[in-house]
Every structure is written in structure tokens, then in C-alpha cells.
Amino acid sequence: MRLTASAIAGQFGLTVLGDGSTEVSGVATLAHAGAGQLSFLSNPRYRPQLADSQAAVVVLRADDAEAAKGTALVAKDPYTAFAKIAALFDVAPVCEPGIHPSAVIDPTAQVSPGAHVGPFVSIGARSRVGDGCVIGTGSLIGADCVVDDGSELLARVTLVTRVRLGKRVRIHPGAVIGADGFGLAMDAGHWIKVPQLGGVVIGDDCEIGANTCIDRGALEDTVLEEDVRVDNLVQIAHNCRIGAHSAIAGCSGIAGSAKIGRYCLLGGHVGVVGHLEICDKVVITGKSVVRNSIHEPGEYSSGTPLTDNRTWRKNAARFKQLDVLARRILAVGKEKE
């Protein structure tokens, strides 16, 4: 597929600088783009690459337009504009409607004639798969699940039981949704399993990364509201609620019954203690641990920043003496009084 700069600008409301008839057939980074490819500049640290880039078209802000050698598309937010343009060249294989002969479908399950059910799929009792859905190879849909219209389960996705997916949900390989929550009670020195009788509800336009686990609730449902984006290898425990338009980066863990607001961003390897609340529009930076509820929007961090090993070892040794040093300072203060 080849598109002109003018056609792209018209589709996404961008301004063309230079030759609008310039054609592009793909996308690439500034450093590696060649003839016929489109790139973008959004982060100032990559501005030096603009002068040497061989990209046919570059999406950038108006402030950077003078540095562009060839055709440019001016956007208020170049990264968002690039994402929309790149989607034009992301041609996924077409999955034709139909059920593969190796699929096993319970007689009480309902599968839309417009859905694609791939090889070795299993669909359990009373579950429903909507129109335009794609159920990838080896995926398992347990009993009493709903996969609404236009949703896609890539290979080896597991919906254990009582999982309801909204429209246009995309789940990547290896994800497990609706497994038992980690509910235990101690009785006479032995653990007793607490039955997990709830389910999982995932709203429209959510995306769940590979090998992520979202446990079903003990009594009430675990809920992800609409347009939540979850990266790979994330654990969301039972009875959590994630607000709409929030995003959670890889290797994060959210303990049971935590409530996260709308438009929140959690960096990689963030830990959230259970039974707390995070308000809307909170950013938690990578490797932070949230131990208390957050009631004010903003950016929050915890942990030790990276430094050279020698400095870190000295600081670690001093940290062990922190209580002693604090007592000495208090004692000096009292003496001066």
C-alpha cells in the first residue's frame, strides 16, 4: 500500500509542509527510515537524528518544522499522530468466520456465525462468543463466559469461568483470566481455601498483555472498566477494580481488593498493597510500592534510584545506622535547648 503525504494529512487533520505528493509505503524510526518510509519526532533527545534521516516524510511539531529536510506533517502530538498512521500499515491476517474441526464446543454454548474459532479451541457450557470475534489456536473458554462482539483471544488464552469480556477486547497469548483468587483462611494450623464465587468483568476496548493473570473475585467481580491497557506479566488479584483509561506496565502486581482510579498510569514492576484506593489521574513510577491510599492526583515514586555500586554500598551501610544517627541528632538538639 502506498499513500501520499496529502492523503495522510487529510485523513488525520495534519498540515503538509513540502511536497504533498510524496508517497510512503511503510514506517520506521528516524535513524533507520529509508526512501518511501514515514517517521516521527516527538522526543527532543532524537532531534539531532532529524538532519541525517532518510525518511520520505516526518511527523513533527511546528517548532521542529524548519529542521526537516523533506516533506513534513505537522501535528500537535506527533506520537499520537504516528500511532494512527502506523495502523494503516498494520495489515493483520484475515480470519474467516467458521469453526475449525478440531474445536470442542459444548452443546449449550452459543457461537456467532460471524466468529472465527481456531484449531484446538475449547468452549464450555453456557458460554457465548459474539459476532466478529477471533478465538485463537489452543484457547480455552470455560463455563459461563461471554466474549462480546469484535473481541480477539490470541493463541492459548484461558478464560477459566464467569469471565465477561466487552466489545473489541484484545487478549494476548498465555493470559489467564478468571482463575481462583488467592483466598485462604487458617484453621487449626492448616489452610482452608476460600471459594472464589465471583467473576471477572472486562470493559470495551481493553487490551491484556501476554502471560498476565487476572483473578476472579471471591464474592464480587474483579472489574476492569473500559479502555484499560495492561502489559505483559501483570498480576491483578481478586476483587480489584481498575478505572477506565488506566494503563499498567509489565511485571506489576496489584493485591486483592485494591481500587485504582481512572486515567492512572503504573510504571513497570509497581506493587500495590491490597484494600487501598488510588484516586483518578495518578502516575506511579517504575518499581514503586504503594502502601497507602492516594487521594490527590499527581506523580508518586518510591525506591532507591540507581547509582554506582560503591556509592550504593556506602549508603546501604549508613542506612543501617540511620536510627542511631537520628537519636544522636535529637540528643544534640535537646542539649542546645
UniProtKB/Swiss-Prot annotation:
Coiled-coil intervals: none
Acyltransferase is among the record's keywords: yes
EC numbers on record: 2.3.1.191
Known catalytic reactions: a UDP-3-O-[(3R)-3-hydroxyacyl]-alpha-D-glucosamine + a (3R)-hydroxyacyl-[ACP] = a UDP-2-N,3-O-bis[(3R)-3-hydroxyacyl]-alpha-D-glucosamine + holo-[ACP] + H(+)
GO molecular function: N-acyltransferase activity
GO CC list: membrane
Keywords noted in UniProt: Acyltransferase, Lipid A biosynthesis, Lipid biosynthesis, Lipid metabolism, Repeat, Transferase
Pathway where this protein functions: Bacterial outer membrane biogenesis; LPS lipid A biosynthesis
GO biological process: lipid A biosynthetic process
Residue numbers annotated as active site: H238
Source domain of life: Bacteria
InterPro entries referenced in this protein's UniProt entry, alphabetically: Hexapep, LpxD, Trimer_LpxA-like_sf, UDP_GlcNAc_AcTrfase_non-rep
HAMAP family: LpxD (MF_00523)
PANTHER family, per the entry: UDP-3-O-ACYLGLUCOSAMINE N-ACYLTRANSFERASE (PTHR43378), UDP-3-O-ACYLGLUCOSAMINE N-ACYLTRANSFERASE 1, MITOCHONDRIAL-RELATED (PTHR43378:SF2)
Cited function: Catalyzes the N-acylation of UDP-3-O-acylglucosamine using 3-hydroxyacyl-ACP as the acyl donor. Is involved in the biosynthesis of lipid A, a phosphorylated glycolipid that anchors the lipopolysaccharide to the outer membrane of the cell.
Similarity annotation: Belongs to the transferase hexapeptide repeat family. LpxD subfamily.
Assembly, per entry: Homotrimer.
Name of the featured protein: UDP-3-O-acylglucosamine N-acyltransferase
Organism: Xanthomonas oryzae pv. oryzae (strain KACC10331 / KXO85)
